[in-house]
From Swiss-Prot:
ICP22 and protein US1.5 mRNAs are transcribed from two different promoters on the US1 gene. The lineage of its organism: Viruses, Duplodnaviria, Heunggongvirae, Peploviricota, Herviviricetes. Tyrosine phosphorylated. Functions as an E3 ubiquitin ligase and plays a role in the inhibition of innate immunity by preventing IFN-mediated signaling. Induces the ubiquitination and degradation of host STAT1, STAT2 and IRF9, resulting in the blockade of ISGF3 nuclear translocation. It comes from the Viruses. GO terms for biological process: protein ubiquitination; regulation of gene expression; symbiont-mediated suppression of host innate immune response; symbiont-mediated suppression of host JAK-STAT cascade via inhibition of STAT1 activity; symbiont-mediated suppression of host JAK-STAT cascade via inhibition of STAT2 activity; symbiont-mediated suppression of host type I interferon-mediated signaling pathway. Pathway: Protein modification; protein ubiquitination. This is E3 ubiquitin ligase ICP22. Belongs to the herpesviridae ICP22 family. Residues 1-129, 147-178 are annotated as: Disordered. Residues 84-97 have a biased composition (Low complexity).
């Protein structure tokens, strides 16, 4: 057996001078530029604060130009881009022509889905009239009626095939004539045919 030392250096729990843990890859914090006090500004300029301020402004410009945006806030189930957090510099907003913000939003995938507009169907107002008006030709004009006189005393003929559309207006007019004694009847099949023509 190998001899194990009683206090190996690997088990030493005293903290050594370690650097603080590095931040996670996505959570890089920007340093604020240090404002020089009045006594320091008279003497020499603060070189470190100038370099840190240029780094942070370059990071912001790089983030905006690279197409990266901050993730949207979620309020009540809807997503909103936090546009107040984004700042544009004077060089970007000067005379660059039309902005491509719409294209950037579409490529980033942060577009808010808007419901597609429903196309409105044309509204058709039908005037439904009682049977005396139907006989007078308000709903069924005289053009659609048959030329030969309608015989009301004849019993109704057996129903014709639905494929024969040439006789449909005659049949409807005949049925309207036969039902003229009824208080108020509708021939929905004929009305549909007239509307669809």
């Amino acid at each position: 057996m190998a001899d194990i030392p009683p206090d190996p250096p690997a088990l030493d729990t005293t903290p050594a001078n370690h650097a603080p843990p590095s931040p996670l890859p996505g959570s890089r914090k920007r340093r604020r530029p240090v404002l020089p006090s009045s006594s320091e500004s008279e003497g020499k300029p603060d070189i470190e604060s100038e370099s840190s301020s240029t780094e942070s402004s370059e990071d912001e410009v790089g983030d905006l130009r690279g197409g990266r945006r901050r993730p949207p806030r979620e309020l009540g189930g809807r997503y909103f881009l936090d546009l107040s957090a984004e700042s544009t510099t004077g060089t970007e907003s000067e005379g660059t022509g039309p902005s491509d913000d719409d294209d950037d939003d579409a490529s980033d995938g942060w577009l808010v889905d808007t419901p597609p507009r429903k196309s409105k169907r044309p509204r058709i107002n039908l005037r439904l009239t009682s049977s005396p008006d139907r006989r007078a030709g308000v709903v069924f004009p005289e053009v659609w009626r048959s030329d030969r006189p309608i015989r009301a005393a004849q019993p109704q003929a057996p129903a014709q095939s639905s494929g024969d559309r040439a006789h449909a207006p005659r049949r409807s007019a005949r049925q309207a004539q036969m039902r003229s004694g009824a208080a108020w009847t509708l021939d929905l099949h004929y009305i549909r045919q007239c509307v669809n023509q």
